[in-house]
């Protein structure tokens, strides 16, 4: 997950408060010495001989780790290219903005994919400080399968009502940004993508009433911004000191304020629905049925005999943003940019989309049959996945791999994704080919392995194994709804003079956040989405 935050040293964080230690009792450098000693002890206590034998690509000692973290954050792509050249088919270590990581080779993928001692959830909790106040809002969902069950039961194959709400919200967002004019409008692609994905997700997970409520949207954006910034800056501190440090960080204070505001809003929302339910029961009337994330969450907590309140409801929104929003936004932006750069392929995809919408309407069936659009999105994800290293894990118990590498409990691992551009697997792997997976899909077995939502050893864009992204089916539906509107009724192109470039932010390679596109509504729109569901 990408977080646009510069590295910050402990000394910079300390500027926000005053040390109350008498200068005649302790030297001024005493706190720094303590921090360094804690870091030394922690580093060596959590390492082992097998891991220390692996080559480091960006640091050789403890005292160079700060510079190594900053170098990684600014130019991780260059470091990864260097590592792949120096250590092909071998594991290696790297000091990242999140700490030390062991990078495993794709040859080990089948071996680790379902190992119960390698946990995705625990890695996520550690990276985002799940035990620290404010960040701990995610803990309920990390310790249970409620979110996974919600998605499996309600979003694997979205019903017509969900698709219609996604379509209505897409029309609302695009009209808000572009209006009905046929004049070209210059838009920041990152902002447009984030607004589309954020609002479409909110329409389904928080419901029709809240998804356009200004106070909710503002507090939600405020929370996620301060949460990401605070999470990143806490990684500048040795782990044993992070709990203490967070009390003095303005980002963490802002995060808690926004979290409290969200809980207040949701407390009223939960109480309103509860009162409606009780009133209907008392009057002997049929209960009003909701079909959104909060209704699904209430059902799942009830089945488990757990309380349902604003705290749990807020945690649901946090987890959705953490595990899905960034990756979906990233794929939408990259997919749009790839289509802009390949007008011939875009025209073929547009014709396919229009044909399906006219014959099948906007349905799960028509989305399944949009082979070219599906293929183009999967290709964008292959060429530039949301993270350059994927399949993050935390080792929960000592593990010895078949190559002899011993992973001690607490070790953090990533998987190299070089095989997604391996010429032995993909022809012309550096080239974006919209039809690549459509062709594979037409081959025997391709229907189950070459779709956007397919997870295979050769394409791990949504993860692999027991921790593969459960929400990938909903993400695919959301993307196809948004792009159906854009392809059918809008024209878009690069802004004049814009060079397409990519920026490294730690493990993520993003489209330049300043990139803009020109968009206008067609004089004669191809599809009337307001009536397509009436057929």
Regions from the language model: what does each represent?
Residues 415-449:
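Conserved cytochrome P450 K-helix/beta-meander segment immediately N-terminal to the heme-binding cysteine loop
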Residues 345, 455, 466, 472-510:
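Cytochrome P450 heme-binding "Cys pocket" and the immediately downstream C-terminal segment
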């Amino acid at each position: 997950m990408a977080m646009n935050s510069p590295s910050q040293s402990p000394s910079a964080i300390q500027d926000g408060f005053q040390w109350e230690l008498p200068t005649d009792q302790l030297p001024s450098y005493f706190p720094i010495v303590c921090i360094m000693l804690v870091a030394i002890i922690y580093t060596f206590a959590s390492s082992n001989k097998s891991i220390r034998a692996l080559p480091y690509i960006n640091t050789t000692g403890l005292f160079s780790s700060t510079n190594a973290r900053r170098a990684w954050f600014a130019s991780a792509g260059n470091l990864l290219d260097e590592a792949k050249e120096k250590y092909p088919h071998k594991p290696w270590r790297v000091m990242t903005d999140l700490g030390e990581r062991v990078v495993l080779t794709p040859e080990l993928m089948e071996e680790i994919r379902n190992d119960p001692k390698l946990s995705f959830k625990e890695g996520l909790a550690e990276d985002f400080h799940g035990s620290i106040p404010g960040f701990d809002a995610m803990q309920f969902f990390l310790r249970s399968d409620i979110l996974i069950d919600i998605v499996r039961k309600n979003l694997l194959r979205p019903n017509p009502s969900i698709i219609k709400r996604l379509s209505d919200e897409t029309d609302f967002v695009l009209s808000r940004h572009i209006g009905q004019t046929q004049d070209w409008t210059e838009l920041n692609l990152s902002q447009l993508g984030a607004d589309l994905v954020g609002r479409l997700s909110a329409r389904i997970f928080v419901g029709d009433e809240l998804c356009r409520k200004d106070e909710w949207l503002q507090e939600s954006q405020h929370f996620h911004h301060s949460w990401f910034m605070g999470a990143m800056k806490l990684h500048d501190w040795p782990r044993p000191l992070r709990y203490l440090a967070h009390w003095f960080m303005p980002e963490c204070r802002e995060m808690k304020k926004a979290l409290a505001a969200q809980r207040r809003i949701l407390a009223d929302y939960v109480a309103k629905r509860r009162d409606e339910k009780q009133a209907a029961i008392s009057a002997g009337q049929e209960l009003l049925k909701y079909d959104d994330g909060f209704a699904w969450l209430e059902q799942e907590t009830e089945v488990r005999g757990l309380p349902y309140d604003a705290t749990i409801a807020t945690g649901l929104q946090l987890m959705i943003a953490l595990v899905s929003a960034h990756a979906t936004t990233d794929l939408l932006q990259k997919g749009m940019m790839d289509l802009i750069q390949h007008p011939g392929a875009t025209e073929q995809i547009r014709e396919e989309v229009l044909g399906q919408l006219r014959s099948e309407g906007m349905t799960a069936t028509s989305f399944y049959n949009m082979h070219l659009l599906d293929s183009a999105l999967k290709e964008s994800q292959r060429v530039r996945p949301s993270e350059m290293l994927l399949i993050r894990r935390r080792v929960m118990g000592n593990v010895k791999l078949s190559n002899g590498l011993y992973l001690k409990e607490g070790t953090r691992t990533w998987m190299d994704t070089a095989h997604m551009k391996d010429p032995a697997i993909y022809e012309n792997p550096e080239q974006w080919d919209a039809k690549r997976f459509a062709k594979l899909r037409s081959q025997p077995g391709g229907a189950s392995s070459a779709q956007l939502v397919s997870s295979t050893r050769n394409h791990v864009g949504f993860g692999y194994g027991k921790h593969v992204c459960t929400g990938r089916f909903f993400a695919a539906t959301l993307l196809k709804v948004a792009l159906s509107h854009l392809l059918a009724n809008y024209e878009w192109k690069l802004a004049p003079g814009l060079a397409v470039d990519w920026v490294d932010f730690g493990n993520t390679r993003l489209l330049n956040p300043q990139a803009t596109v020109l968009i206008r509504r067609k004089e004669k729109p191809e599809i009337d989405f307001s009536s397509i569901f009436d057929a």
